[in-house]
Regions:
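Exposed beta-sheet edge and beta->alpha loop/turn motif
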Residues: 131-162
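A mature extracytoplasmic/lumenal domain signature
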Residues: 118-120, 132-134, 172
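Short, low-complexity N-terminal intrinsically disordered segments enriched in polar/charged residues
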Residues: 31-76, 80-81, 184
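C-terminal segment of classical bacterial N-terminal signal peptides
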Residues: 21-29
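Short beta-strand edge/turn micro-motifs at domain boundaries
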Residues: 34, 127, 151-179
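Hydrophobic pocket/interface hotspot
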Residues: 62, 73-75, 82, 98, ...
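Bacterial N-terminal signal peptides that target proteins for export
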Residues: 2-16
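A solvent-exposed, acidic/Ser-Thr-rich amphipathic alpha-helical stretch
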Residues: 57, 71-123
Length: 185
């Protein structure tokens, strides 16, 4: 096991995770209820609590943007100079890229939901394993859906600066998604 992560008892780890999630919540309970909470949270030993909380909050805001399509959350999560380090062909760089991707996905899968299965926080990085689900009832690149289920994963690595996502490296299970949409064999 890396020296960065010291083993802790299950109860200690759960209490630490709960405290970090609670510390990362927005000021009011109503706002807190609206943010996606990671199913599993791992924070590197020795990371200052304030830094960890800010990083968790940025990642939760961005995860909730993908869950809801609320562009205000993307604007709050992403730095003004946000850079997509694995920019797909044809996607705009910076904030316009994820906003357009979300619109495209929601046009195809209006009931799209996103859960944060795992979140790992270390240094200035946050790794998230996201799980998307919904039904293809809209259209995607001219193809109409027939209600078929959509269920795919992504993994993102965020670099956080000043409490916002400055860089993102990501990989999606695109072949799985395209097969579910009926666009690939």
């Amino acid at each position: 096991m890396s020296a960065l992560f010291r083993p802790a008892g299950r109860l200690t780890a759960r209490l630490l995770a709960a405290a970090l999630v609670a510390a990362a919540l927005p000021p009011t309970a109503a706002q807190a209820d609206d943010l996606v909470t990671p199913r599993e949270l791992t924070v590197a030993a020795g990371l200052p609590a304030a830094q960890a909380s800010a990083q968790v909050l940025a990642a939760r805001r961005y995860g909730t943007f993908w869950d809801t399509g609320d562009t205000a959350l993307a604007r709050a999560a992403l730095a003004p100079d946000f850079t997509d380090r694995t920019l797909p062909a044809g996607r705009a760089q910076g904030l316009p890229g994820p906003l357009a991707a979300s619109r495209t996905m929601r046009a195809a899968v209006p009931d799209l939901r996103c859960e944060i299965e795992q979140m790992i926080v270390a240094g200035d990085r946050v790794v998230v394993h996201l799980h998307f689900r919904g039904h293809f009832t809209g259209t995607f690149n001219g193809t109409a859906g027939h209600g078929q289920p959509v269920d795919f994963i992504t993994t993102d690595i965020y670099r956080i600066a000043d409490g916002r996502i400055a860089d993102n490296w990501h990989i999606e299970a695109n072949l799985t998604l395209m097969r579910q949409l009926g666009l690939a064999n």
